[in-house]
Amino acid sequence: MRDPVSSQYSSFLFWRMPIPELDLSELEGLGLSDTATYKVKDSSVGKMIGQATAADQEKNPEGDGLLEYSTFNFWRAPIASIHSFELDLL
């Protein structure tokens, strides 16, 4: 009798939906055809995959348009701006 715990059908990898492949033509339609700023493999330790190097950022001074909508920047509360006249009121 087969052990149900070690069965291939109880595996997470068996039941999860496969990740769809990216269509590069869709990325070009979104204006993201320049894939040079996205690194597939990075040898330096402590650096996130997909993070542009300093040399790449100098080549592209306007920056990546999607960095504004990263999960950290999108979900955090905005930094309050306090002007000098407001500080005088405190």
From Swiss-Prot:
PTM notes: Ubiquitinated, leading to degradation.
Q: Where is this motif: Nuclear export signal?
A: 24-32
**Locations listed in the record:** Nucleus; Cytoplasm; Cytoplasm, Cytoskeleton, Microtubule organizing center, Centrosome
UniProt keyword list: Chromosomal rearrangement, Cytoplasm, Cytoskeleton, Nucleus, Phosphoprotein, Proto-oncogene, Ubl conjugation
Q: What is its main location?
A: nucleus
| Superkingdom of origin organism | Eukaryota
Q: In which tissues is it expressed?
A: Expressed in myoepithelial cells of normal breast tissue (at protein level). Highly expressed in thymus. Expressed in colon, small intestine, prostate and ovary. Not detected in peripheral blood lymphocytes and spleen.
Q: Which GO cellular component term is one of those annotated? A: nucleoplasm
Phosphoserine (modified residue): where? 84
Q: Which InterPro entries does the entry link to?
A: MLLT11_fam (IPR026778), WRNPLPNID (IPR033461)
What biological-process terms (Gene Ontology) are attached?
extrinsic apoptotic signaling pathway; intrinsic apoptotic signaling pathway; positive regulation of apoptotic process; positive regulation of DNA-templated transcription; positive regulation of mitochondrial depolarization; positive regulation of release of cytochrome c from mitochondria
Self-association and partners: Interacts with HSPA8 and LAMP2 isoform A; the interaction may target MLLT11 for degradation via chaperone-mediated autophagy. Interacts with TCF7.
Function of the protein: Cofactor for the transcription factor TCF7. Involved in regulation of lymphoid development by driving multipotent hematopoietic progenitor cells towards a T cell fate.
Q: Which family does it belong to?
A: Belongs to the MLLT11 family.
What pathology does the entry list?
A chromosomal aberration involving MLLT11 is found in acute leukemias. Translocation t(1;11)(q21;q23) with KMT2A/MLL1.
Q: What is this protein called?
A: Protein AF1q
Recite the lineage of the species: Eukaryota, Metazoa, Chordata, Craniata, Vertebrata
Q: Which gene encodes it?
A: MLLT11
